[in-house]
A protein has these predicted regions:
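Short, mixed charged/polar active-site loops
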Residues: 424, 435, 639, 662-666
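Catalytic core segments in nucleotide and nucleic-acid processing enzymes
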Residues: 319-566
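C-terminal, charge/polar-rich interaction regions
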Residues: 548-577, 639-644, 648-653, 658-660
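Basic/aromatic-rich interaction segments and small domains that mediate binding to polyanionic partners
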Residues: 587-622, 627, 635, 643-670
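Donor-sugar nucleotide-binding helix/loop cap in glycosyltransferases
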Residues: 1-331
Length: 670
């Protein structure tokens, strides 16, 4: 009988990121839909709730059937967080639990407050044998089957690595009804033939077409489902990325060996459901296995000369041993993150490419068949924080550790799990003589100011009080709303004791930041001092420009400074006339201190040669200043140029030419 291929799905293509499940499940757990997720009205209602809470984006009411809710329900049930539906042939629903009600394991999942705890929940769920074999009588665990394949590969080749195309053709298309050795034979044959193929893409396409002859759905599914399946399998914590494929996590090798299984279970599915909903046991629940895993981890850390100390922890029970192991895993993760941070200066081009994807609205960039980057459209907020964190690491010279800079969580592949929570800034970069607090948002509408204006200023204010050094704020978004720029242009904040602060916050588009970031690396001059100089220059005219002009000025400064870096041009050394704020105090070597009360401007369209405008408090409402600081726009007279300022000294009122009087060295701003 010919082979009939059936691709198993540990996840769902409508919910490609398992890291979002806990957030959605938390919304569900506090809703009126607990125990009521079936039926059109409930599905539509829960979908609307997910949309309202920002968990999904049901653009323009695109989904009117409630399919979003069904996809989330499927993932809740498949992982044992709610009671799944029991078919009549398999038993009675009441023997398991009320349909769609939260299970004891679901409660444990809600209480998982670390990423390691979340991973363990998924690992317990994926270890359950609940996927039917073609005979309809046996059930298997895709994770355990795949681990068996990878361990056999390691036995033969020395590495458990499984590439994307290998997983696509011989990973999720097989199960324990196949012979393990034959599957690995096919993988190694594919690997050998592909290694000598001159055109990898054409080779892969041909192999997919050949394997697809025994598959009755779209052949695109081989690769499309691969990416989703591998992402779900990685959240178990036992597997991690290797290129676009998978490899067993070195510190979890013993656990992988204990979990691997080449046979299927013949027990009734309702028994597997009971196991699933109560929290399936893991090998690490056994003292001996837990101790073996801990000993192996300590050996690996000693081999890498990583210091650790767990002498203060009891090691009598499996739970205590696992607590000690998690402490060491955290130390190891921090050490790996420091190494990752050191390498970011060599990854600036990839960082640039990620920024480009975010600016475009997400998507994928394929370098070659084995290397690609992707920004999922529904994860752009997390990826924006993440890529700016990587940019900061690439610029380097920080005195705080990389894991102290960020507020968001990372997975074992250093990819973002979710955006940072509220209550603090996004990225805290502390340098020797100053600190930069970076805040980011994907919001682009006029709501941007309402959402970000207050928290960003509060976070920068808190940082000013915390650090005994200058603090600069960078607000980065794909688009900067003018109302947001206006809030940061003033930058006023009052502390709890009513102390007034004028905060230094510069709004930059992601494209502007990207331009300057790339220029620094192309010029081989990546340095936080240059970033500070950009911020200082951008904010230099905020006091005299209206927000539209200030945004334009920022764009001009970024372009000018980027060009100078790329062309290796030094900054101008000649004196530049200062920008004169309304009511400014100036000092003249002859007349002493004086105050600006008016300005003189030339408007070609006006009958008068010169027009005097009051300038003690601000420009008149009918006049605005352009980004260059010297050009004015008058509602009636059109465009004009500042040619002088009227200054009141103690015994004299003088009209001083601009810019000449302000660059000859006898007159200074006070």
């Amino acid at each position: 009988m010919s082979e009939h291929i059936d691709i198993w799905l540990v996840g769902n293509t409508g919910l490609r990121n398992p890291n979002r499940i806990q957030e959605g499940f938390s919304v569900f757990a506090s809703s009126s839909f607990v125990g009521k997720l079936h039926g059109r009205e409930n599905e539509l209602g829960f979908m609307r709730l997910l949309d309202e809470k920002g968990i999904i984006q049901n653009e323009d009411g695109k989904d009117v059937s409630g399919s979003h809710a069904r996809k989330w329900r499927l993932m809740f049930a498949k992982n044992g967080f709610i009671y799944p539906q029991v078919k009549k042939k398999d038993g009675q629903q009441e023997d398991l639990g009320r349909l769609d009600d939260i299970t004891p394991f679901g409660r444990a999942f809600l209480n998982a407050d670390t990423y390691a705890a979340v991973q363990e929940c998924f690992l317990r769920a994926m270890s359950v044998e609940q996927f039917p074999l073609p005979d309809g009588e046996h059930y298997f665990s895709p994770l355990r089957w795949l681990l068996a394949i990878m361990l056999e590969l390691e036995k033969r080749t020395g590495s458990s690595e499984l590439s994307r195309i290998e997983f696509a053709l011989w990973g999720h298309t097989t199960n324990p009804s196949y012979d393990l050795e034959s599957v690995v034979d096919n993988i190694l044959d594919l690997r050998q033939r592909r290694a000598v193929a001159p055109a990898k893409r054409a080779f892969d396409k041909k192999e997919i077409a050949k394997r697809g002859e025994n598959y009755d759905k779209k052949s695109d599914n081989f690769l499309d489902y691969s990416d989703m399946n591998m992402r779900y399998l990685r959240i178990s914590g036992v597997l991690q990325r290797k290129g676009r494929g998978l490899i067993i996590v070195p510190t979890k090798h013993i656990l992988a060996e204990k979990l691997a299984k080449v046979t299927a279970s013949k027990g009734p599915i309702i028994e597997q459901y009971r196991l699933l909903c109560s929290g399936a046991p893991l090998p690490t629940d056994n003292v001996d296995v837990a101790k073996a895993l801990l000993d192996d981890l300590m050996k690996q850390m000693k081999d890498r000369h990583i210091l650790f100390d767990i002498t203060d922890l009891p090691l009598d029970t499996a739970a205590e041993i696992n607590i000690a192991r998690r402490r060491l895993e955290n130390t190891l993760a921090q050490t790996d993150e420091i190494q990752y941070a050191k390498d970011q200066c060599n990854q600036w081009q990839e960082i640039r490419d990620y920024m480009s994807l975010i600016i475009k609205g997400g998507g994928k960039l394929v370098y070659d068949e084995d290397n690609a980057i992707e920004v999922p459209k529904d994860e752009m907020p997390a990826y924006l924080e993440w890529i700016l964190w990587r940019a900061a690491l690439a610029i380097d010279h920080m005195v705080n550790e990389p894991y102290e800079v960020r507020g968001f969580k990372l997975d074992s592949d250093f990819l973002p799990v979710s955006a940072a929570g509220g209550g603090k800034g996004d990225l805290y970069c502390e340098f020797e003589d100053f600190a930069i607090l970076t805040e980011v948002t994907m919001s682009t509408s006029s709501r941007q100011e309402a959402m970000e204006g207050e928290p960003v200023r509060r976070h920068v204010s808190d940082a000013v009080l915390k650090y005994d050094k200058p603090v600069y704020g960078m607000f980065i978004a794909v688009h900067i709303d003018t109302n947001t720029a206006e809030t940061f242009r003033h930058g006023i904040w009052y502390t709890k004791d009513d102390k007034k602060q004028r905060l230094d916050i510069v709004p930059l588009t992601l494209a502007q930041f990207q331009k300057y970031f790339v220029a620094m690396f192309e010029a081989n001059k990546a340095d936080p001092i240059l970033l500070r100089s950009l911020i200082v220059k951008c904010e230099s005219r905020r006091g005299i420009l209206e927000s539209p002009a200030w945004k334009q000025y920022i764009d001009e400064v970024v372009a000018e400074k980027s060009q100078k870096l790329v062309n290796r041009l030094p900054d101008q050394k000649h004196r530049i006339a200062p920008l004169i704020p309304a009511g400014a105090i100036v000092n003249d070597v002859c007349w002493g201190n004086g105050q600006v009360v008016a300005l003189i401007a030339n408007f070609p369209e006006c009958n008068k040669t010169c027009v005097e405008l009051p300038y003690l408090m601000s420009l008149p409402d009918e006049v605005s200043r352009c980004a260059d600081g010297q050009t004015l726009l008058h509602d009636r007279f059109g465009e004009g140029t500042i040619s002088g300022y009227v200054v009141v000294f103690k015994n004299k009122i003088l009209t001083l030419n601009y810019p000449d009087s302000f660059i000859k060295g006898t007159l200074n701003m006070v």
